[in-house]
Amino acid sequence: YFAPGASQYDRHLMYQTYDVTELVQEGENGLGCILASGWWSDSFSFRLYNYNYWGDRPSFLGRLVITYEDGHKETIVTDDNTWQYFGEGPYRYAGFFNGETYDARLEENYFNFSKSDFKADGLKKPEVITPVVMEEQEGIFPGAACWPAMNEKEPELVGSYQAPVHEVETFTAKSMTEPLPGTYIYDLEQEIAGVPVLKFKGKAGQKITIRYGEVLYPDLPEYKGLVGQMLQANLREASNEDTYYCK
């Protein structure tokens, strides 16, 4: 999850390496990737005006190196003349602070996108993106260190030196409540950073909203009518919710 991680992208861009030997077939092959905003574009903190520090859209730089049995190598790189962009898949939005929007009705447009014979309406020519030049700094609090740091040189491509984010443990909800009709709260009794796993049935186009929080409104007079519901005021401007449209 979340590759390539957070760095000051105008200084260092960390790349990931994968062994795809078992995926390469004789004849024509297709190479595809799925992009989200990450730390590159979108929100950079819970203050939503800290936005698009490095670029204004998800971007990708990659290459495939094939080593043949006789030892010679062939390198295939991302190129705006040979690659194509498709923006009508089911992932409509994905961001660290505002969650993900997924429309399952668009999955058929998306199947086999990494196959050589993939065809879909709406394929577009990609653009070469120039990273944003950092000319100003901002501190969250008076006297605090400012960030991002100013540009000093061209970005350096370096191999990832950090362990990837991966699944460590699976938690099951300890309890469930329904403070409002059709609104269910699942309590894990544990602070985690993770991915929810839910099973449900719905009609095509039905919207399912999943929100996340740390505390519930307490039983106090000032919270009359809200007791037992999820409190998200401490999340500041981050919406912190996922939206799923059934197919």
Which role fits each region the language model picked out?
Residues 1-247:
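Extracellular/oxidizing-compartment recognition motifs
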